[in-house]
Amino acid sequence: DCPWDWSSHEGHCYKVFKLRKTWEDAEKFCTEQARGGHLISLKSTEEVDFMIKLAYPILKANLVWIGLRDFWRDCHMGWRDHANLLYKAWSDEPNCFVAKTTDNQWFRRKCNISQYFVCQSRVPR
């Protein structure tokens, strides 16, 4: 079973934190709250719906950190004229992502901004 103040869904435990932290600090905080804890990973529409039902009553219309980071750096990119992508000028600021507490939209945010967040861990055995 999940800890008493966490919610259970599909083999995972979840908790909304009404604390504002940077992405790094929120991820670290989640690892300290529960064994195997991390920022929430949203892998299905059902999981997003569950997160919204959990987070909206606490945070109202807001944004929460999710466990997705550096997505664009992992994409295969190329120039329209098929030239090799040899010169790169990415900013040093990694891209982190937030989810809305009202629908299934995600947005990029600078990782050093403080946001609310949702932690997730596996149900303890």
UniProtKB/Swiss-Prot annotation:
SMART domains to which the protein is assigned, alphabetical: CLECT (SM00034)
Domain C-type lectin per the UniProt entry, residue ranges: 9-120
An annotated GO cellular component: extracellular region
GO molecular function list: toxin activity
Main location: secreted
Keyword Disulfide bond carried by entry: yes
Record-linked PANTHER family: MANNOSE, PHOSPHOLIPASE, LECTIN RECEPTOR RELATED
Name by which UniProt lists this protein: Snaclec B7
Record organism: Macrovipera lebetinus
